[in-house]
Amino acid sequence: MVPKFYKLSNGFKIPSIALGTYDIPRSQTAEIVYEGVKCGYRHFDTAVLYGNEKEVGDGIIKWLNEDPGNHKREEIFYTTKLWNSQNGYKRAKAAIRQCLNEVSGLQYIDLLLIHSPLEGSKLRLETWRAMQEAVDEGLVKSIGVSNYGKKHIDELLNWPELKHKPVVNQIEISPWIMRQELADYCKSKGLVVEAFAPLCHGYKMTNPDLLKVCKEVDRNPGQVLIRWSLQHGYLPLPKTKTVKRLEGNLAAYNFELSDEQMKFLDHPDAYEPTDWECTDAP
């Protein structure tokens, strides 16, 4: 059994699968998100970079307004991320307000992340100061990081002004880029590991090892990859532009991979990122 929710270090619950919304055309985003909520998704991941925060919010709000008596805001977990150009105290303060304005009907942001460590130590920590204030002001419930390596996490955890610890680190993880040392380190420091690009942007869907396991468990490659992530204790963020695949991806909760199948899929020595790499940034 894998849990439907993880408990964050600050006490909040986070659904253990999120619908990733990167590269979904803006014109389709609200409908995909709305259909996602209808079929059971409760966690949605976007970013300033994606240019679709408003549309993600619109899809959620459409569902909330459909049946206000039964559809509650507290059921939804909404994540967004500050882009590199918004790093720095003043810029981050303004950007956080803008992020909330994009989804004002949601009233608050469940999780706000720094999208990457690329802007350097000074701006990273200034941004964190602004994010901590957003928590204190009730604009944001939880804060975290993305694409952070061990040294970036240590920098933050050892910062004398740290008041609100990061609750997650969102990094690319799949059987072909396992980052075991970093993932274990995050967990040891109380950070939930969110796995972006858990489906490898589709590049591995015909991989023979993956297809062998798919045949054994009678599931499709996407479901097996999501399940692999869950059984490692990660929080996968699968994306789809196809409504009919939404429900199928959630079916990853409904079967189990054996220890042998998990080990067969693991490629601990592989390093095949399908997205940007900045966990090693200065």
From Swiss-Prot:
Q: Which InterPro entries match?
A: AKR (IPR020471), Aldo/ket_reductase_CS (IPR018170), NADP_OxRdtase_dom (IPR023210), NADP_OxRdtase_dom_sf (IPR036812)
Keyword Manganese part of the UniProt annotation: no
Source organism's superkingdom? Eukaryota
Residue sites binding substrate per the record: H115
State any GO CC term. Answer: nucleus
- Keyword terms: Oxidoreductase
Protein name as it appears in the record: Uncharacterized oxidoreductase YJR096W
